[in-house]
Amino acid sequence: RYVRAMVVLVTGFVAVSMAGLTLAIAGVAGPLQVGVVGLALWAALLVLWGRAPVSGPARPDPRTWVLVAGLLVIAVSGAANVRPQGLYVLTNRDPGIYVAGGRWMAEHGNLVVDGGVEAVPGLDSLDGLVAAGAGQTETDGDPNRIQIQGAHLFPTVLAVGEWVAGDVGFGAAPAVVGALALAAFFWLALKLLPDWAALAATVALAVDFAWIYTVRGYLSGPTLLLVGFAAAALLLDAVASWPTRPTRLAVAGFVAATALTARVDAGVVILTVPVLVAVLVRRQGAGARTGRALGWWCLGAAGPAAVAAVDLSLRSPRYLSDLGSEA
């Protein structure tokens, strides 16, 4: 049941986030539009994954007390991290652009900020006050078309949080993502370790200061961890079900490539995943059809990769140009 719940939660998070980002790039994002498209994409991912149990070598089911304890750790960690309501984010430099972008998207449904809109009415009338924004640049020299720096998945998550629960949802979004990331870590650990060791590792991560700070104040980091842990767990199950259910590899590829819409440098890791897919499939022996398996994974990854490319080239070209010059 925990595995099925995680498949549902992860695919739901990815589906709604990708729907919101795609519609925001087009300038038509809103709670109704994102809800309809997100639910349709979510349903498609669940159908592609299917309800059949994972085949392949069986692992013993985790004991009930381990699952209960793990869920309790995740719940307590999430509750503790949600209490600050994003105050770490509001006082930290880099995530500030996520906050500004998320607010704009929630209220206007697009990723092009109108430079003529004052954040605080009457601000320009105050003598001696100069305002400047970091992480925002003009588009083609037009001060009324301002780019929001970077990839835009997390501003989308913040916007969805506001649509769902107003300011409370907006401020709670980092902690919710962090709780899902911790749950995905527990899910992956249960596949690789004895259940007691998976629980111990989850507890150690939940109380680690670096983890707590990352969840409360870094934003893109927990999103990558959520996608990464979940994609790895899905990949293990998809390979175990190969070639009976090839569409599971497509779902694993879709989730993994979503990382590209959160951070550009995630591409360095994503490029190595096809190698991992080939190695895992080849271990099944003769007749494993490695090339076909890679094709299914890449087919799933193509959609989010295309959205990430369009997002950067159309809605953050200055940032993309700066990355190119640094490279």
Question: Which positions does each model-derived feature cover?
Answer:
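Short acidic/glycine- and proline-prone juxtamembrane loop motifs at membrane-interface regions
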Residues: 174, 210-224
